[in-house]
Amino acid sequence: MPEALDASPYDALLLLSFGGPEGPDDVVPFLENVTRGRGIPRERLKEVGQHYFLFGGISPINDQNRALLDALRKDFAEHGLNLPVYWGNRNWAPYLTDTLREMAADGRRRILVLATSAYASYSGCRQYRENLAGALATLEAEGLEVPRVDKLRHYFNHPGFVEPMTEGVLRSLAELPEDVRPGAHIAFTTHSIPTAAADTSGPVEEHGDGGAYVKQHLDVARLIADAVREETGIDHPWQLVYQSRSGAPHIPWLEPDICDHLQELHGAGVPAVVMAPIGFVSDHMEVLYDLDTEAKAKAEELGLPVRRSATVGADARFAAAVRELVVERAAVESGQKVTPCALGALGPSHQLCPVGCCPARAPKPAAAGADSPYA
C-alpha cells in the first residue's frame, strides 16, 4: 500500500468544466444556457448549433471529463490520496449547483476546485469563480450548510501539463511527410478573447499592460518549442495564434486567426504546419470543429500538409500533476512551506486570486479568491 498523502483540510475535489450537449435535443437548450441574458433568438442558436449537429449533437467534452475523472480517481488511489472527486458544469448536466448540493449532503465542508482551464482570464477563471459564488448563494438560500471552496492555482506551466503537449507536437511532426518535416512551422493555438479581456487578465501588478493570458501562452509555447529543438535538433519556427472567435465583429479580439495564419504561411512558402492547441485541456468542440474540420479544410484547399497535436486530456501525467497541486495547496492551507512546481520564465501562479484579478464588465460576487464572500 502506498504511504497516505494528506489533503487536509480538504475533504473533496470538484472538477469544474464548461459542459456540453449529449444529444441533438440538448443542443439549443445548452446554447441558451451559454448565451443567457444576451437575447439571442432561438433560430440563431439553431444555426450556431450546426457545429454540434455535425457530430450528432454530442459534445466530446463530457466523455473527456469522464475519462479525466477516472484518471484522477485511479491516480489518487494508487498514491494513497483519500479524496473523493466530483464533477459539475457551468452550462449543462451535471450542473454545478446540483453537484455542490450533493457534496453538501455528503458532508463535504472544504472543497478544492480544478477548473478545466489552465490560464488566467475572465472566462477561464473569474467566471468560474462567479459560478461558484452563485451556486453557493443558492445553497445558502435553501438553508444548507455552505462549504468553503478554494480553487487550484493556474497550472499552465506545470510539467504534467506541458510535457504531454510537447510529446504530442513531436508525434505530429513525425507524422508529416519526411521531405517537408524539417521546414514545418508550429502554430500554437488558443481560444481568442476580446483584447480588453486579455489586457486585464491576471493581477495587474504582476503582468502590467497586456495581461497574463497572452504571456502565459507564450511561455508555454517557448517551453514546447525549446524541448522540440532539443529532441530533434531542428529549430522549428512558431507563432501563437487564435481560434474560436465569437461576438460582435466591431469588438477587437486577439489575432491572427488560425485560418488566416495558414493562408499567410502558405503564401510565405512554408511547406507544412503542426497545429498545437495548447490553450485547451481536452479535445472538445473548439478543437474538433475549428481545427480538425475548419482549419484542416483550409489547409487542404491550400495544399498545405498539416497535423494537429493532441491535447492533454486524461494523460496520466496530468492526473499526477493535479494530485501534486492538491497536496501543494493542502500544505499551504496547513501553514507549511512549499516549493510549487513550475517550468518557464513566469514561475508558479498565485494560490489565491487577488482582488481585481480578471475583472468582469459588470462586477459579480466571486468565490475562491481574496474577495470571496464565502471565505
Curated annotation (Swiss-Prot):
Catalysed reaction per UniProt? Fe-coproporphyrin III + 2 H(+) = coproporphyrin III + Fe(2+)
What is the first-listed, main subcellular location in coarse terms?
cytoplasm
Q: Which Gene3D superfamilies match?
A: 3.40.50.1400
Keyword Chaperone found:
no
Top-rank EC class of the record's enzyme? lyase
Q: Which Pfam families match?
A: Ferrochelatase
Which Enzyme Commission number(s) are listed? 4.99.1.9
- Which is one Gene Ontology cellular component term of this protein? cytoplasm
A GO molecular function held by the record = ferrochelatase activity
- Biological pathway: Porphyrin-containing compound metabolism; protoheme biosynthesis
Question: Example GO biological process term?
Answer: heme biosynthetic process
Cross-referenced InterPro entries = Ferrochelatase (IPR001015), Ferrochelatase_C (IPR033644), Ferrochelatase_N (IPR033659)
Its localization reads: Cytoplasm
Locate the residues binding Fe(2+). H191, E286
Q: Which residues bind Fe-coproporphyrin III?
A: S59, Y128
> Does the record carry Metal-binding as a key word?
yes
Q: Which UniProt keywords apply?
A: Cytoplasm, Heme biosynthesis, Iron, Lyase, Metal-binding, Porphyrin biosynthesis
Which family, according to UniProt? Belongs to the ferrochelatase family.
Biological function = Involved in coproporphyrin-dependent heme b biosynthesis. Catalyzes the insertion of ferrous iron into coproporphyrin III to form Fe-coproporphyrin III.
Question: Can you say what this protein is called?
Answer: Coproporphyrin III ferrochelatase
Q: What is the lineage of its organism?
A: Bacteria, Bacillati, Actinomycetota, Actinomycetes, Kitasatosporales
